[in-house]
Swiss-Prot record:
Source organism superkingdom: Bacteria
Protein name stated in the entry: Small ribosomal subunit protein uS5
GO biological process, one term: translation
Its job: With S4 and S12 plays an important role in translational accuracy.
HAMAP family in the record: Ribosomal_uS5_B (MF_01307_B)
Cross-referenced InterPro entries: Ribosomal_Su5_D2-typ_SF, Ribosomal_uS5, Ribosomal_uS5_bac-type, Ribosomal_uS5_C, Ribosomal_uS5_N, Ribosomal_uS5_N_CS, Ribsml_uS5_D2-typ_fold_subgr
Single annotated GO MF: rRNA binding
Keyword annotations of the record: Ribonucleoprotein, Ribosomal protein, RNA-binding, rRNA-binding
Gene Ontology CC terms, in alphabetical order: small ribosomal subunit
Record's comment describing the protein's domains: The N-terminal domain interacts with the head of the 30S subunit; the C-terminal domain interacts with the body and contacts protein S4. The interaction surface between S4 and S5 is involved in control of translational fidelity.
Pfam families in the cross-refs: Ribosomal_S5, Ribosomal_S5_C
Keyword Ribosomal protein in record: yes
């Protein structure tokens, strides 16, 4: 039993997951004796081949908060359908709280034109050519979640073709 657990952990580590911390913030809770300080970390994980997730961790120290954030992000991973030119398949908007993110596919060689947390999420998802704009809130957490929301709602060409009952070539035309 223990060997199986170890092998699953090794497989998890062998895969090419990268993690980036978007924000570390010191937060406080008012208790009877005064203020209790803790840290909140917003973490993005991705394998740069179409899987990405955002997580939040809170702990008494920074390392513990980041570890919890990575664990939370692994629970909220979404698959991103990418084209051959490493862009998204169609225009999409994402919303989380007061943040709204607009994304448009871009031609090869354009690069990732996005700012802040949105850029980090897109890079870890493996998107190489995209135009993105943050609207509304400037909160890194809400912008990251809005980006993941949009990426999770993307549909691949093959799924659309199957849904409509036509060949993929008809969709491209």
């Amino acid at each position: 039993m223990a060997k199986r657990r170890k092998s699953s952990k090794n497989k998890e580590k062998e895969t090419n997951w990268q993690e980036r911390v978007i924000q570390i913030r010191r937060v406080s809770k008012v208790v009877k004796g005064g203020k209790k300080l803790s840290f909140r970390a917003i973490v993005v994980i991705g394998n740069e081949t179409g899987k990405v997730g955002v997580g939040v961790g809170k702990a008494g120290d920074v390392i513990g908060a980041v570890r919890k954030g990575v664990s939370d992000a692994k629970k909220h991973v979404v698959d991103v359908p990418l084209t051959k030119t490493n862009t998204i398949t169609h225009r999409i908007n994402g919303v989380a709280g007061g943040a709204k993110v607009m994304m448009r596919p871009a031609a090869p060689g354009t690069g990732v034109i996005a700012g802040g947390a949105v850029r980090t999420v897109l890079e870890l998802a493996g998107v190489k050519n995209i135009l993105a704009k943050q609207l509304g809130s400037s909160s890194p957490l809400n912008n990251a979640r809005a980006t993941v929301d949009a990426l999770g709602n993307l549909r691949s060409f093959s799924s659309v073709a199957q849904e409509r009952g036509v060949s993929i070539e008809r969709i491209y035309a």
